[in-house]
Design a protein with these regions (language model features):
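Structured catalytic-domain cores with a bias toward divalent-metal coordination
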Residues: 2-358
Length: 358
């Protein structure tokens, strides 16, 4: 059914009961125009027995052309994506584009409402729930809908992240090394077009169930970001997000080109897991290095002060490789084995840009 919202042109509820989350038909995706839709998910609580959760989905289409899916709020304590995509949904007009733009500003809406990384409904991490399960919990059902109905329709998927409450990043796009040379080339060029200060080829600690992995396995182009963190949004990180969206849309020829010069990105990588530094004990972490600063192997980059053993000296945290500090703990209080720093090294991507199956 259709519902008119006063401030929005059109809203279409996509309803699910005891079945897969799905569109009632494909009309919204296949017709030109700007549609503000809502995925209606039954959500029974102690205070609302027959309640529902509405997940906004914005679809803008103008003729044939490339298609891109933008997602934010994969984790509920990361805010650059939701704000930038909310603004994009308001500002982008059908006549501005050639192709299709799909926007999901709050992918894990329950977590966004709670301000938590994980969903308060089922305790799951959205970014470890793909490709989803139509018969699973709310998070798994949303993941299934996004993968089956949205990812399948798009050429490129761009998923906004930041460090959340627990980490802070030097602003960067994130991509992965891929075996398919043509897919890798297109991914590198897309990251370059976004023009974040750093483009980080990241070796994930755990990639099972990630949206990244699901999209890459489908042989589509996937880019993510890590823009700041600490549970807040800065003018710098939001500007990077907003400018980057427009840059990417021009690169994909969804928006027309312009003559503006975009800043160059610095390609870096986590060459191995030696770039990840974990807290050897719990306590208060004193960082000695600013994000973006160079470090050398063996250099003391921080100290952990015990909260209980006052007479003990602070434990030094030393860099295991030469490189640049791209991530640090977002809070002073850390637990044992928390990731408290990530060090990256420069990467020459010229081979990725030139080697392809063309």
């Amino acid at each position: 059914m259709f519902l008119v919202w006063k401030k929005l042109r059109l809203s279409k509820f996509i309803f699910t009961g005891n079945m897969s989350l799905t569109l009632t038909d494909n009309q919204t995706f296949n017709q030109d125009g700007k549609f503000i839709s809502a995925l209606k998910i039954p959500h029974s609580t102690n205070t609302s027995g027959w309640g529902s959760l509405l997940l906004p989905v914005i679809i803008i289409r103008n003729g044939d052309g490339p298609s891109v899916l933008f997602t934010g709020g994969n984790h509920g304590d990361e805010y650059e994506g939701p704000i930038a995509l909310r603004k994009l949904a308001n500002e982008l007009k059908t006549e501005d584009i050639q192709g299709q733009v799909i926007i999901v500003p709050y992918l894990n809406f329950p977590a966004i409402l709670a301000g938590t990384r994980l969903s308060p409904v089922d305790g799951l991490n959205m970014n470890r729930s793909f490709p989803g399960d139509p018969d699973g919990s709310m998070t798994q059902k949303i993941a299934d809908f996004v993968y089956r109905e949205l990812v399948s329709r798009c050429d490129v998927v761009f998923d906004f992240h930041s460090g959340g409450n627990s980490m802070i990043f030097e602003p960067c796009t994130v991509l992965h090394k891929l075996e398919d040379s043509e897919q890798m080339k297109k991914t590198v060029l897309a990251a370059k077009s976004f023009s974040a200060p750093i483009s980080l080829v990241l070796q994930e600690l755990d990639n099972k169930g990630m949206l990244d992995t699901a999209v890459e396995n489908a042989k589509k182009i996937f880019i993510s970001t890590e823009l700041g963190g600490g549970g807040f949004v800065s003018p710098r990180t939001l500007t990077i997000a907003e400018n980057g969206i427009r840059n990417l849309l021009r690169h994909l020829e969804i928006l027309p080109p312009d003559e503006l010069l975009v800043p160059q990105t610095r390609f870096m990588q986590t060459p191995d897991f030696g770039g990840y530094l974990m807290a050897p004990q719990e306590g208060l972490y004193e960082t000695l290095i600013e994000l973006g600063e160079s470090v050398t192997k063996g250099q003391v980059i921080g100290r952990i002060h015990s909260l209980t053993q006052i007479e003990d000296p602070a434990v030094e945290v030393r860099a295991q490789i030469d490189g640049v500090l791209v991530t640090r703990a977002g809070r002073a209080q850390v637990k044992i084995w928390d990731t408290i720093a990530v060090i990256a090294t420069d990467l020459d991507v010229s081979d990725f840009e030139t080697n392809s199956t063309d």
